[in-house]
């Protein structure tokens, strides 16, 4: 998740999808559409869960997570445009995943030092 997901996601979102959208829309509109798609796809991480009655949207965390993912996607898109390369976006995406994974790990780590 820290390395391979960012490679695939950046190739798809900032590479293929962004370019395809730019053939039809302005750069600004294309970037917004691509970032909104990124946010929507990532709702499954913290905004949507599978309950007994099917998929459920978590009313508190879903909007926060969606906005965070759209903002992070804008950072990745800016890095891609500024550098004219996917590598900085991939590196930033990998760093973001590492930090998020570390935060989740530390939050779930037992409070006591006994194992």
Residue ranges and their predicted role:
Residues 1-115:
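Transmembrane helix-loop-helix hairpins at the membrane interface
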